[in-house]
Design a protein with these regions (language model features):
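Structured catalytic-domain cores with a bias toward divalent-metal coordination
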Residues: 2-416
Length: 416
């Protein structure tokens, strides 16, 4: 009997070690599916590699629009900062040329580092689409770099470590809410001390993550982690204790412009989540039947991920929902464009994305063990939100151009 127990124990240990070895190999060799469509050089001209250059080119494109339409407003909002005196949200507003019926709001950079791609899409929209659009009854508001600090310093969050897309609320109750699921995972999500990629915890991060998936399920974990939390100021996905300066600054602009229109349609541009090389249409769950039907009309022929399946999650304090709450008299249509980068809809892609976020946040708050760790971590995060692949960049612009061109025509038919 003793011999049998020893054999069984050896087998169990072998199975466990084999599983750890297999998942470690899978994790360490994971790469997202490559975009095979060749890059078009015409699409690449819209990309720049710094906040300052993106802002400069956004303004240049806006100035061209100013020559095409009447009463165009090109302006900026200075965002208060203890670190940098030159952080601005820039915007271009083209009013409906004859009768104000519908307004499009195309916003970018809510998650700072995602602003590179958002800026490129906005530049393309102005250069290739807006100049040829009929704006007799439709106005357009382009908001560039909603989180200029995160954009400039390659962070997803603001200077106060606030996730701007978890911060937006006109109800103080949000900032006092408790995400119990997040608290249960706090130690895993927010490790202390200098970050070292060679530590056992980081080298075998996927083992801990898979254990949590088995314990809670992927859907439950994803929701608990990503929906937002308001208890831990240095933690991931912190939504803040009050409205961030960026949101306070843009709110009166949104109210002032939107009040002239019966129908307001917001597209907020993001990168990161989902299949690499795919443009996902990703709103929060919608119960209003007319609103859902109108979105399906606007994006006819395109798949909409309604945020109510196992692969997706909902958030609290998001920017698109906030706009609707501050303009209650308007018929408001929200949508999020998410350009997938790391195949985060897969288990390994999701784990890699989370690990990237954890070590970047740990390094920012507690420093890095070595310069090599710092360089590798920051490079990985930038790649996750702004892929270096020219094929990926070109396809992102092409997909955006096709969908925006079609949806703008469909939007013209929407009535309150």
């Amino acid at each position: 009997m003793k011999k049998i127990l020893i054999i069984v124990s050896i087998l169990l240990v072998s199975i466990v070690l084999g599983a750890i070895g297999f998942t470690t190999f899978q994790y360490n060799t994971f790469t997202p599916v490559a975009v095979m469509q060749d890059a078009d050089s015409k699409n690449l001209v819209y990309f720049q590699n710094s906040y300052d250059e993106c802002r400069k080119n956004f303004i240049l494109s806006a100035n061209k629009i100013n020559k095409k339409f009447q009463k165009v407003t090109i302006s900026k909002l200075k965002i208060e900062s203890k670190k940098d005196p030159d952080l601005t949200i820039n915007y271009c507003y083209v009013p409906a040329q004859k009768k104000s019926k519908r307004l499009l709001i195309l916003s970018s950079g809510v998650h700072g580092i995602e602003g590179y791609v958002g800026s490129a899409v906005q530049q393309m929209f102005m250069e290739d689409l807006l100049v040829n659009m009929n704006l007799s009854e439709m106005g357009v508001l382009l908001i560039h770099g909603m989180n200029p600090y995160g954009f400039k310093y390659n962070r997803r969050v603001t200077e106060n470590n606030v996730d701007l897309n978890r911060n937006c609320s006109n109800d103080i109750k949000l900032y006092k809410s408790i995400n119990a699921g997040y608290s249960d995972l706090y130690t895993m999500l927010n490790p202390k001390g200098e970050v070292s990629l060679k530590s056992v915890k980081n080298m075998f991060f996927q083992v801990n993550a898979i254990q949590k998936i088995i314990q809670y399920s992927m859907g439950t974990l994803r929701q608990a982690i990503l929906q937002g939390q308001y208890q831990y100021p240095e933690g991931l996905y912190f939504g803040g204790n009050e409205l961030e300066p960026s949101i306070r600054a843009i709110t009166p602009v949104l109210k002032q412009i939107a009040k002239n229109y019966a129908v307001v349609f917001n597209i907020d541009l993001h990168t990161g989540y989902g299949a690499r090389g795919t443009l996902h249409l990703f709103p929060n769950p919608i119960n209003d039947k007319k609103l859902k039907n109108d979105l399906e009309t606007i994006f006819s022929g395109n798949h909409i991920d309604w945020g109510d399946g196992d692969d997706f999650y909902t958030v609290t304090g998001d920017f698109t929902s906030y706009i609707g709450r501050i303009i209650p008299k308007q018929y408001y249509i929200p949508m999020v464009f998410e350009f997938g980068t790391l195949d985060s809809q897969t288990t390994m892609g999701s784990i890699r994305s989370l690990h990237n976020m954890i070590v970047e946040n740990q390094g920012f708050h507690h420093n890095y063990k070595t310069e090599k760790d710092e360089t590798k971590i920051n490079k990985g995060v930038l790649e996750m939100y702004y892929p270096s692949s020219e094929n990926w960049k070109s396809k992102a612009i092409e997909d955006a151009k096709i969908i925006l061109s079609k949806s703008m025509k469909q939007f013209q038919s929407i009535e309150r």
